[in-house]
């Protein structure tokens, strides 16, 4: 499942100074994962990108370890519990523990809203725990910063996709920033 989600990124090439996204993958299909620490190596081809997968205590995740994965009904019924993109026909599918879990409050959206109102006092403070990072993008920091500056100044642009459900599929290259 993690490798499937990591295919959202294009494979990084040595002349690139930004990361690009695969325009054939809708951005709402990208999932980040909590409860584990990991690296996503964009220099590797899809299917071989998740590296250094560890539990929060630092112990390596083993092939025999099991996970409890919570997801909304859309992700469960379109990817997690069907033979298609993640699991091939004939492979064992994950065991469904519960479906359409609803309390007195309602579904996942309502449960999250109730949690924010009652436990967090109506406000949540964003917090990044840095349990994952992108690696394999071995650009020179100065080249990357120059690309960021040129993008902010409007001197360079990432391609605009006709479809608002995708992110830019083009990376900025060293040749492009060398023109400035």
Regions found by a protein language model. Give the residues of each.
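Catalytic centers of hydrolytic enzymes
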Residues: 1-173
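Extracellular/lumenal glycan-associated surfaces
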Residues: 175, 179-180
């Amino acid at each position: 499942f993690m490798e499937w989600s990591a295919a959202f990124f294009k494979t990084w090439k040595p002349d690139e100074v930004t990361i690009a996204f695969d325009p054939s993958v809708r951005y709402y299909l990208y999932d980040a994962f909590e409860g584990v620490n990991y690296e996503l190596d964009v220099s590797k081809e899809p299917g071989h990108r998740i590296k250094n997968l560890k539990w929060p205590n630092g112990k390596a995740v083993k092939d025999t370890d099991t996970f409890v994965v919570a997801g909304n009904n859309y992700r469960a019924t379109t990817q997690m519990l069907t033979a298609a993109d993640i699991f091939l026909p004939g492979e064992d599918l994950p065991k469904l523990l519960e479906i359409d879990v609803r309390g007195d409050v309602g579904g996942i959206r309502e449960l999250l809203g109730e949690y924010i109102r009652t436990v967090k006092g109506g406000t949540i403070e964003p917090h990044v725990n840095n349990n994952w990072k992108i690696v394999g993008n071995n650009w020179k920091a100065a080249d990357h910063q120059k690309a960021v500056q040129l993008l902010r100044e409007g001197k360079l642009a990432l391609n605009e996709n006709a479809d608002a459900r995708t992110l830019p599929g083009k990376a900025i290259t060293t040749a492009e920033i060398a023109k400035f």
